[in-house]
Design a protein with these regions (language model features):
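Short, hydrophobic alpha-helical segments
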Residues: 9, 13, 174-181, 249
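A Rossmann-like FAD-binding core segment of flavoenzymes
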Residues: 34-129
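Mid-to-C-terminal Rossmann-like scaffold of FAD/NAD(P)H-dependent oxidoreductases
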Residues: 146-241
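A short, polar/charged loop-to-alpha-helix boundary motif
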Residues: 239-252
């Protein structure tokens, strides 16, 4: 898919990208680095504000614009126009974008219909599990993007849409199926690169209720809080391995 997108966008010279999350931002930055004219449409005010918070969202939105990406915030895509080929993208809150290529990275919703029909409890839009990936129905397990797994560290269920989590959870779920010791006790972590900037995050996700952003070494650290509890730490272009952040998150 990546090869096809790169080839089509490079040949066309212009591309619309729908979505202000990690997929949309990474695609927009990668295509712009290849010299493609890019329009990024998103319903949010700032890119990646959901997982990273307002401060880093503002910094990354400015970075994209500085590098030539046309960012259209609060733009809800309503239609793709064209017959045999794409001609334009229409959006509420933005002018029509004349492009021959579009990439949609607007997120997914887990398909839980079968689970619900089988009587499985759901939560956070996915299948509810305990710490050992057991669902509410005996001998049925769930892992990966669809699983809302109980985290004793967070004190709530987490549904993390990331390949590293899916890989780890699958191994633990298999151990649980075999009646071997298996307990979800991870602090989720992910990283991304946007142009030559590096992003890392460690924490439990969810809405950022409050944040403290600190300029550091030309980059930024953002500490996410819920009341007086640390729930996540995000960093942009800062040399920090986040080990201390992990320790604080584990300590609650």
């Amino acid at each position: 898919d990546a090869d096809l997108i790169r080839a089509a966008a490079a040949e066309a010279g212009r591309c619309a990208v729908v979505g202000g999350g990690f997929i949309g931002v990474e695609v927009a930055a990668s295509l712009r680095a290849l010299g493609v004219e890019v329009d990024l449409l998103m319903i949010e005010e700032r890119v990646l504000e959901g997982p990273l918070g307002r401060a880093l969202g503002e910094r990354l939105t400015a970075l994209l614009r500085d590098r030539g990406v046309r960012v259209h915030p609060r733009a809800e895509v309503t239609a793709f126009h064209g017959e045999s080929e794409l001609v334009s993208v229409a959006a509420r809150g933005a002018p029509a974008i004349q492009v021959p290529v579009a990439v949609v990275g607007a997120g997914i919703a887990p398909a839980t219909e079968l689970a619900e029909a089988a009587g499985l409890q759901t939560d956070l839009g996915g299948i509810a599990c305990d710490q050992a990936f057991r669902t509410s129905v005996p001998d049925v397990f769930a892992a990966g993007d669809v699983a809302a797994v109980w985290s004793p560290l967070a004190g709530r269920r987490l549904r993390v849409e990331h390949w590293a989590e899916a890989l780890n959870q699958g191994k633990l779920a298999a151990r649980s199926m075999l009646d071997m010791e298996a307990a979800y006790d991870r602090v989720p972590y992910f990283f991304s690169d946007v142009f030559d900037s590096s992003i890392e995050y460690v924490g439990f996700g969810g809405p950022v209720e409050d944040e403290i952003a600190v300029e550091r070494d030309g980059g930024m650290m953002a500490y996410h809080l819920s009341g007086d509890r640390l729930t996540g730490v995000a960093k942009l272009d800062v040399d920090d391995d986040l080990q201390r952040a992990r320790e604080l998150l584990r300590a609650g």
